[in-house]
């Protein structure tokens, strides 16, 4: 039962900047996790790592290998993306407003409060302190909000809230006044600053600064002789019309011989930042000492809207600007020609970024939890994903374990592809919260129950609501099920305490089951019999024979409110959970209690900020609200008002394992001990909303209602969502399960879908390397290298290099992503190769070793599987015809009398 975290679905984008690497790989923060989406394959995966709180800043290395993730508590993770592991950790001393790798990948610029710090990127050598700070610029008068490196990684353009942008020379210069150049004239914060490059010389000749009030400043650079003699006084520098001579902003070398009235700043002389040799400096022009001229100032004309996100593409000379009213503009620079001006939503855009080629634009809206990628040339969407805005209430697997359906308080039903991690259907017909879901056995239709008084049936082929089940008097439905044959649909109510039974085909009410005296929150048909089990807050579980119309067959009484009910897959056992934290197991045939599990202590843990008692004494309110049997019925999963999902062995009534659904401190109930100094007269200080979201740039939070305390005269705060699990569902294959939690839908799986391939790091993947591996009898490695090269002749050569006795071992070592290519090669060999038994042996071992993987990815592998089936069928037919012909010939020869 080695379940591991595999993916996160349904979680909304909650803010922070998105990053695109390798032109098609979109990296975005999802709470305290990182989501990676391959736009070319439409595949999304969430990395199996967490930060302490919600992520607010991301930055990737130029080659896309490393990722920096900074959370709200200034803790930074240095992540290796190919291996999906955290390499290093560091904590900054103040809020991080901007973060960026240098183009050469050697340095990292971090805007920490008013400071700009230059850190050396961790290398491949092991070190006690992998991060090395090599320089600090303390020239800004307010928070730094934007950074941009020059192409040669020698200059840094910094924008801040003090209405100015500064150009720094990162290197230390000998005998030259290292004073930052100021770009002034802005009337609001500089939210974006970028370098423009001359396409002929590939040198910086322009700069663009974007103010929060919607004005774009274009600056031109002119080289001039600014070299200084070592004996020349610093005051001999001719003052620039846009650079005031401020003594407190000058950074000089220690003992550099500049005027004594200038303030000296001692800095660490970091390796790699020292100046060039004196002989090389004679012919060098320093960009921060040259002449910068304001060429033009253009306004976006968005009235009272503010700029909240922007990006610039050097190759296309284009600027994209996102505003607080949901409008974005795409402009051709430097002439400021508007190419597109469109509205995405009515909420502010929190991120806007180009891809490497510049043909795709990525936008994020934290208020709506929406992330989309748009091709501005063809005006089409490449990706449009939006998680559930509110908590997910229910989740269920399809019978083939390929699809996952979710329903939430935002009145929407979403259907997800489990393998790709993307949502491909969203149904919005419900007008109130969706409370229950049920997949039909045909795998093509879904039932959903809602508080709006309807039960709807959805068709996946036509993407529509083909039938709606209602009652004469509107009722609120909180539970739903259907019989295994799909003829009857049943739903339990919240207000009338009844169970309605409809005919699935006609939609007419067949029966109304009465007897419960409280809301019916649990409902399930027996998998093998015609019994219907219902649980209610009236301390009872009732069994009904719906088809015989006999009413209640049997009643199981409890000592507390019954919250949910679940049948074992064989239908001979029934599990029910109660408000006191117990799980009761009943024999449905004999009608007796078999086992009882005391789970209150197992689910205990986590203290909410408004709790008056400690976590150790707060277990009285903990209970299991959802249960789910395993495919074989040997263990059961239980979860509820806690941060844990518990797995129990039913026969021994012992806790096998406990899964913590999140370590995100932005949620309430994660910690066992709270800091007493954070308690004030108005309540916990963390629940007081004292931040101004309009000034937080790309950071925004979703509104979850008035959950906390309010200050007099201030608007109600948003509070913190409480961590819990509302629904569980185990895949029919038994190899994965899904949990609808506060963070989203977590998927845990036994199958290790990610296997790190060391050959991905090799630079010598050549045909010669394949030949050498074959000669060294490393056929597994040779096969992997040949499939990476994707050369058909090499792949076939490696297949024949494997001895028949070693085929099984080599087949097991083949990676999942190479299965399709290997099958295509086997199909070609079946059609053109005389070694039929050898190739069939390969096919047999591939199917044995990767059967579960092929079943999970059958949609992707379907073309290769069909080709393989056709090739085998054709070979079988040819052999059958030959054998039949030979058989008839032998019969004829045997029947001919021997005349000799």
Curated annotation (Swiss-Prot):
Chain spans, region Disordered: 228-284, 684-720
Listed Acidic residues bias regions: 275-284, 687-697
Gene Ontology BP annotations: embryo sac development; regulation of stomatal movement; response to sucrose; rRNA processing
Record's note on what induces expression: Induced by sucrose in guard cells.
UniProt KW keywords: Developmental protein, Nucleus, Phosphoprotein, Repeat, Ribonucleoprotein, Ribosome biogenesis, rRNA processing, WD repeat
Start-end of Basic and acidic residues biased regions: 261-274
Pfam families in the record: Utp12 (PF04003), WD40 (PF00400)
Matches recorded under InterPro entries: G-protein_beta_WD-40_rep, PWP2, Quinoprotein_ADH-like_sf, SSU_processome_Utp12, WD40/YVTN_repeat-like_dom_sf, WD40_repeat_CS, WD40_repeat_dom_sf, WD40_rpt
Phosphoserine modified-residue sites: 275
Primary localization class, coarse: nucleus
WD repeat copies, ranges: 10-47, 50-89, 91-129, 139-178, 185-229, 302-341, 344-384, 387-426, 429-468, 472-512, 515-554, 557-596, 619-658, 720-759
Assembly: Component of the ribosomal small subunit (SSU) processome. Interacts with TBP1 in the nucleus.
Its biological purpose: Involved in nucleolar processing of pre-18S ribosomal RNA. Plays a role early in ribosome biogenesis, especially in the maturation of 5.8S rRNA. Required for guard cell functions.
Listed name of the protein: Periodic tryptophan protein 2
Organism classification: Eukaryota, Viridiplantae, Streptophyta, Embryophyta, Tracheophyta
């Amino acid at each position: 039962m080695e379940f591991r975290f595999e993916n996160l679905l349904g979680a909304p984008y909650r803010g922070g900047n998105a990053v695109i690497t390798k032109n098609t790989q979109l990296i975005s923060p999802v709470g305290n996790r990182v989501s990676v989406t391959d736009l070319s394959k439409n595949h999304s995966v969430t990395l199996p790592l967490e930060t302490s709180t919600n992520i607010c800043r991301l930055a990737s290395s130029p080659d896309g290998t490393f990722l920096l993730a900074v959370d709200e508590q200034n803790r930074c993770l240095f992540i290796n993306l190919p291996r999906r592991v955290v390499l290093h950790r560091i904590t900054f001393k103040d809020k991080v407003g901007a973060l960026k790798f240098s183009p050469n990948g050697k340095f990292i610029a971090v805007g920490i409060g008013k400071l700009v710090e230059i850190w050396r990127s961790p290398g491949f050598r092991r070190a006690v302190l992998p991060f090395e700070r090599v320089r600090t610029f303390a020239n800004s008068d307010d928070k730094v909000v934007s950074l941009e490196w020059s192409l040669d990684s020698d200059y840094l353009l910094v924008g801040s809230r003090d209405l100015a942008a500064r150009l720094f020379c990162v290197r230390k210069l000998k005998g030259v006044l290292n004073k930052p150049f100021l770009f002034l004239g802005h009337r609001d914060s500089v939210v974006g600053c970028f370098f423009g490059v001359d396409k002929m010389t590939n040198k910086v000749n322009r700069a663009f600064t974007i103010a929060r009030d919607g004005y774009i400043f274009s600056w031109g650079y002119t080289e001039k002789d600014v070299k200084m003699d070592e004996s020349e006084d610093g005051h001999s520098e001719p003052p620039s019309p846009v650079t005031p001579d401020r003594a407190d902003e000058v950074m000089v070398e220690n003992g550099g011989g500049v005027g004594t009235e200038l303030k000296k700043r001692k800095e660490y002389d970091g390796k790699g930042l020292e100046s060039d040799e004196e002989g090389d400096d004679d012919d060098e022009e320093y960009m921060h000492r040259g002449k910068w001229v304001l060429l033009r100032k253009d306004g976006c004309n968005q009235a009272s809207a503010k700029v909240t996100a922007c990006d610039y593409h050097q190759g296309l000379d284009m600027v994209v600007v996102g505003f607080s009213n949901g409008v974005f503009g795409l402009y051709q620079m430097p002439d400021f020609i508007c190419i597109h001006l469109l509205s995405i939503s009515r909420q502010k855009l929190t991120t806007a970024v180009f891809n490497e080629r510049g043909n795709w634009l990525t936008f994020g809206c934290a208020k709506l939890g929406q992330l989309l990628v748009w091709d501005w040339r063809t005006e089409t969407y490449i990706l449009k994903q939006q998680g559930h805005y509110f908590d997910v209430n229910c989740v269920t697997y399809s019978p083939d374990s390929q699809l996952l359906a979710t329903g939430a308080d935002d009145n929407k039903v979403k259907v997800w592809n489990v393998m790709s991690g993307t949502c491909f259907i969203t149904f919005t017909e419900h007008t109130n919260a969706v409370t229950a879901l049920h997949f039909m056995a045909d795998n093509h239709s879904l039932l959903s129950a809602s508080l709006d008084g309807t039960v709807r049936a959805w068709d996946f082929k036509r993407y529509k609501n083909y039938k709606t089940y209602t009652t004469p008097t509107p009722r609120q439905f909180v539970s739903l099920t259907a019989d295994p044959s799909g003829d009857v649909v049943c739903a339990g109510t919240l207000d009338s305490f009844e169970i309605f039974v409809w005919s699935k085909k006609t939609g007419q009410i067949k029966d109304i089951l009465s007897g419960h005296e409280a809301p019916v929150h649990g409902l399930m048909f027996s998998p093998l019999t015609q019994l219907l089990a219902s649980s209610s807050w009236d301390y009872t579980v009732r069994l009904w024979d719906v088809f015989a119309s006999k009413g209640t067959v049997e009643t199981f009484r409890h000592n507390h409110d019954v919250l949910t009910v679940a049948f074992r897959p064989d239908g001979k056992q029934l599990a029910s959970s109660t408000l006191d934290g117990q799980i009761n197991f009943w024999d449905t045939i004999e009608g007796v209690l078999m086992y009882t599990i005391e789970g209150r202590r197992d689910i205990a843990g986590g203290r909410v900020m408004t709790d008056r008692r400690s976590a150790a004494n707060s277990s009285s309110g903990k209970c299991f609200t959802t249960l789910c049997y395993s495919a074989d019925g040997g263990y059961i999963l239980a979860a509820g008002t806690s941060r844990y999902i518990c797995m129990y062995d039913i026969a021994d009534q012992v806790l096998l394992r406990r899964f913590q659904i999140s370590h995100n401190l932005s949620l309430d109930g994660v910690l066992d001990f709270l800091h007493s100094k954070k308690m004030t007269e108005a309540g916990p200080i963390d629940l007081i909303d004292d931040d101004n979201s309009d000034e937080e740039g790309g950071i925004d939070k979703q509104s979850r209602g008035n959950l906390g305390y309010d200050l007099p005269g201030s608007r109600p705060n948003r509070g913190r969502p409480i961590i819990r699990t509302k629904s569980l569902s185990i895949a029919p294959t038994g190899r994965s399960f899904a949990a609808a939690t506060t963070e989203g839908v977590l998927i845990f799986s036994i199958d290790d879908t990610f296997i790190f391939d060391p050959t991905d790091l090799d630079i010598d993947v050549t045909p010669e390397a394949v030949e050498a591996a074959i000669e060294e009898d490393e056929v597994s490695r040779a096969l992997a290298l040949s499939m990476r090269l994707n050369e058909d002749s090499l792949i076939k050569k490696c297949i024949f290099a494997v001895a028949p006795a070693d085929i099984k071992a080599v087949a097991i070592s083949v990676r999942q992503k190479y299965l399709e290519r290997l099958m295509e090669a086997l199909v070609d060999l079946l059609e053109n190769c005389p070694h039929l038994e050898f190739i069939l042996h390969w096919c047999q071992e591939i199917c044995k070793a990767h059967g579960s993987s092929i079943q999970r990815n059958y949609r992707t592998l379907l073309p290769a599987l069909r080709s393989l089936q056709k090739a085998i069928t054709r070979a079988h037919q040819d052999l059958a015809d030959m054998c039949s012909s030979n058989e008839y010939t032998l019969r004829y020869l045997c029947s001919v009398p021997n005349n000799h």
